[in-house]
């Protein structure tokens, strides 16, 4: 199936992507999504397709669900259109990462002004699909997203035939920017050709030293939600990943939370934490939909946020989830090997290969890339390097400032039927998940405490009472004291330690900024690991593989491990 106006053969597809690990398409006008659907289907039906298809598209306004109605498509393609329509719901201004075809097709939809959105990218496309640039500066902006050899298709339908002079100007602008057009027949509806400038391309487009051009062997230290999400993202890209953890099983730390909420943070100014958690929560829900069982491991229930100043906000795109189930699902990818009961005590680098060793000095293997995703453990491991590693003082400062914040979650089963309970989870100052299926019946969860002192955290009785007091303020019921009533049933407490950064945002990126040593960090998920982990993984692998970023370049800096530290010393949950 071809989209009206676009013949995939005019840009060499699908033949040119045969045998490639990945292929990146940049489309400056998403319109009704038909170009994307056409290319997605071509990828599905091609036995020589690349492992990953990245499609980056700009839409000036949020695409309308009705545009993608199933009735517009043949029966065997309706499922694709319906899946896309579902994923396009509730998309606002900004970047949106949408994973399709078992996460092997990545659609990055950028909603907003074309020039602004295009300026937030740093990748180079293999294929460019665009509207005719309005002037030479627009043509130059498109050129910045190309590499030598990029095939392009420029839609000239709006001006073709009506203004031959405009077509001539367009051809001149394109050629001056480095786009070499094929033969242009009279009344052509598009310009096609290759980006092949006569001059040397600026070195600013040269991939960073941190980029690894092809998949290899990677070791990840830590099998919690941070490490598992990175492992899965790398395995999808063909990496052979080994995940080490000192516990016998994955999710041995804070990721073993019995149930938690993936819900966006909100702020009056829609600050980076709010934007990143909104993107990350939506991305995590895509993984859950693909890998977990609804009603058992997770539920896209939505979450009602009670505001401290009064009123409430309904988060439609939010869920409750059992993190350990997702961690286990991520780690079941055939490209991942989990090794438990193994503490990584030292990392050495020689001849471009990292060697990991346990406390007894035993060799745990050699790897091109190592990702430290072991929360507070990363600080101690980084101090033990036996080779010179150039860590910037600012990153050293941020690692030294990591806080171990202890938290306790109360949970149990109902001793009696309770009227007036909410149907969906509620959060605010604390949270309450009213209905999660369990072996002993329907479970409830309330919490969690946020204790910087281990002595206070060790008094589980006091921690439970604090949870119940917070719950009574979150959900004041006239008929009965909710905390006291819940405590009549079978109640347990679950405790763990969170790794919290100075500004409550994770640290993601290469540990060394001056060389591509292959040592990366993904830590500091804090109290919002469910909202950040999947996004952090996408960001890390995008930077490692020179892929399109999952969020705006300017926003991604808020997660960069080497970002400038902003001072913050409070110990309150966000």
Where are these regions (language model features)?
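C-terminal catalytic lobe of FAD-dependent flavoproteins
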Residues: 317, 481-574
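S-adenosyl-L-methionine
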Residues: 69-120
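Active-site substrate-recognition segment that forms the wall
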Residues: 200-219, 225-237, 246, 251-266, ...
């Amino acid at each position: 199936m071809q989209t009206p106006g676009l013949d995939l053969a005019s840009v060499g597809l699908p033949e040119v992507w045969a045998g490639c690990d990945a292929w990146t398409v940049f489309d400056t006008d998403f319109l009704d999504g038909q170009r994307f659907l056409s290319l997605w289907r071509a990828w599905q039906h091609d036995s020589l397709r690349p492992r990953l298809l990245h499609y980056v598209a700009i839409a000036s306004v949020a695409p309308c669900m009705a545009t993608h109605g199933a009735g517009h498509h043949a029966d065997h393609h309706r499922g694709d259109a319906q899946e896309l329509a579902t994923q396009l719901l509730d998309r606002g201004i900004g970047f949106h990462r949408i994973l399709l075809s078992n996460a092997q097709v990545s659609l990055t939809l950028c909603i907003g002004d074309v020039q602004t959105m295009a300026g937030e990218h740093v990748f180079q496309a293999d294929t460019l699909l665009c509207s005719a640039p309005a002037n030479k500066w627009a043509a130059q902006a498109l050129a910045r997203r190309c590499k030598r050899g990029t095939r392009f298709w420029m839609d000239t339908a709006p001006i073709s035939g009506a203004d031959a002079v405009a077509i001539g100007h367009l051809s001149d602008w394109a050629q001056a920017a480095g786009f070499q057009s094929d033969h242009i027949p009279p009344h052509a509806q598009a310009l096609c050709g290759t980006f092949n400038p006569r001059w040397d391309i600026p070195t600013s487009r040269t991939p960073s030293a941190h980029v690894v051009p092809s998949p290899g062997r990677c070791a990840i230290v830590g099998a919690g939600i941070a490490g598992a999400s990175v492992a899965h993202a790398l395995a999808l890209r063909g990496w052979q990943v080994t995940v080490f953890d000192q516990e016998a099983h994955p999710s041995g730390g804070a990721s073993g939370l019995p149930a938690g909420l993936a819900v966006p943070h909100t702020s009056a100014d829609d600050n980076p934490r709010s934007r990143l958690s909104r993107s990350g929560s939506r991305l995590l829900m895509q993984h859950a939909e693909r890998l977990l069982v609804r009603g058992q491991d997770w539920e896209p229930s939505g979450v009602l946020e009670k505001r401290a100043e009064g009123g409430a906000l309904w988060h439609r795109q939010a869920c409750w989830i059992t993190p350990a189930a997702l961690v286990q699902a991520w780690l079941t990818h055939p490209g991942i090997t989990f090794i438990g009961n193994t503490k990584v005590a030292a990392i050495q680098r020689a001849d471009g290969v990292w060697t990991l060793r346990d406390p007894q000095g035993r060799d745990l293997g050699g790897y091109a890339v190592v990702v430290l995703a072991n929360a507070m453990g990363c600080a101690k491991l980084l101090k033990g390097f036996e080779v010179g590693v150039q860590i910037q003082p600012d990153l050293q400062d941020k690692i030294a400032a990591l806080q171990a914040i202890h938290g306790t979650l109360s949970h149990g089963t109902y001793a009696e039927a309770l009227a007036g309970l909410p149907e969906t989870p509620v959060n605010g100052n604390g949270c309450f998940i009213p209905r999660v299926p369990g072996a002993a019946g329907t479970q409830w969860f309330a919490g969690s405490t946020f204790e910087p002192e281990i002595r206070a955290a060790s008094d589980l009785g006091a921690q439970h009472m604090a949870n119940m007091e917070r719950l009574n303020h979150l959900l004041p019921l006239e008929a009965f004291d909710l905390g006291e009533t819940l405590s009549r049933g079978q109640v347990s407490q679950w405790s763990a330690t969170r790794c919290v950064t100075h500004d409550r945002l994770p640290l993601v990126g290469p540990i060394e900024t001056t060389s591509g040593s292959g040592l990366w960090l993904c830590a500091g998920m804090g109290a919002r690991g469910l909202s950040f982990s999947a996004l952090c993984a996408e960001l890390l692998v995008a930077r490692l593989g020179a892929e399109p970023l999952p969020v705006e370049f300017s926003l991604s800096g808020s997660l960069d491990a080497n970002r400038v530290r902003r001072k913050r010393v409070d110990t309150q949950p966000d």
